[in-house]
Amino acid sequence: METLITISRWLAKQHVVTWCVQQEGELWCANAFYLFDAQKVAFYILTEEKTRHAQMSGPQAAVAGTVNGQPKTVALIRGVQFKGEIRRLEGEESDLARKAYNRRFPVARMLSAPVWEIRLDEIKFTDNTLGFGKKMIWLRDSGTEQA
């Protein structure tokens, strides 16, 4: 639990996620502002259905991605690598996520793009501020945490 709490605190302070999807051997990555839900261990993003990454995702797809800062020295590197699943939200689930997203990013009220959830199933958090190469791992299915 401690690992997930540490990772969640760091993710709550960031705001841009990069995620990649694959379809028929073709890979594509995208970036977006995200809202992190620590209870569901998921990102919420907005992206238009006509985008290449949304077309490749369809209603849901496997994803992998990263969240990282931009430190000027190796000793300050912190970042997350993850794998999970992206899906487009519908109905009340979408409405609730959009309200929370709009609170975090008020400018998003101007957008009509659908809300998507990236459910994280595996997270590796690198935090060089705790020592070079310090990694923490969290796995959804097993609840496993490694430091």
UniProtKB/Swiss-Prot annotation:
Gene3D superfamilies registered for this protein in UniProt: Electron Transport, Fmn-binding Protein, Chain A
Xref: InterPro entries: Split_barrel_FMN-bd (IPR012349), UPF0306 (IPR011194)
NCBIfam families from the UniProt entry: PRK03467.1
Family classification: Belongs to the UPF0306 family.
Protein known as: UPF0306 protein YhbP
Protein's organism: Shigella boydii serotype 18 (strain CDC 3083-94 / BS512)
Designated gene of the protein: yhbP
